[in-house]
Design a protein with these regions (language model features):
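Basic/polar N-terminal segments that are highly enriched at the extreme N-terminus
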Residues: 1-8
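Conserved beta-strand hairpin/beta-sheet module of binuclear metal-dependent hydrolase folds
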Residues: 9-62
């Protein structure tokens, strides 16, 4: 089966006037992260950034058009893969250390970032070399 090229990796679906779903349709649904882009008045919000094998910023123009706050819902590998591409990042205090130092054993990539998570592999994928780049948060979130 032919691997998927970077230009075909992401899909965007407009859900409302200012809300867009971004996802990686070649990842099996159990592993797939829903990324959400919300257009704001002064800046935009991006909730989660997917696997990170291909640059989200380079291949989804929507996330590079305006200033953007990037939020991690949690720090599993399939939710923080491209956080390093965005300068303004935030995460809950309980997961800040993982975002800053995303070791595969902390992000569950050591167990789940395998060829089996894909319906079709992305070009250049090598599970043994998969790593998430550090993306320390500039802002910490708390309950309440």
């Amino acid at each position: 089966m032919t691997p998927i090229a970077a230009k075909d990796w992401y899909e965007t679906i407009r859900m409302a006037d200012a809300v867009t779903l971004i996802h990686e349709p070649w990842i099996k649904p159990f592993f797939r992260c829903n990324m959400w882009h919300v257009r704001g008045r002064d800046r935009d919000l991006l909730f989660d950034t997917g696997l990170g094998h291909f640059s989200l910023r380079r291949h989804v123009r929507l996330v590079a058009e305006r200033p953007l706050l990037c939020v991690a819902s949690h720090t599993h590998f399939d939710h923080i893969g491209c956080h390093h591409e965005f300068p303004e990042r935030c995460v809950h205090t309980a997961e800040a250390e993982i975002l800053a130092d995303p070791r595969n054993e902390w992000t569950v990539a050591d167990r789940y970032a395998t060829d089996e998570m894909f319906d079709r592999l992305p070009e250049g994928w090598d599970a043994s070399r998969y790593r998430i780049r550090p993306a320390p948060a500039q802002r910490l979130l708390a309950h309440g």
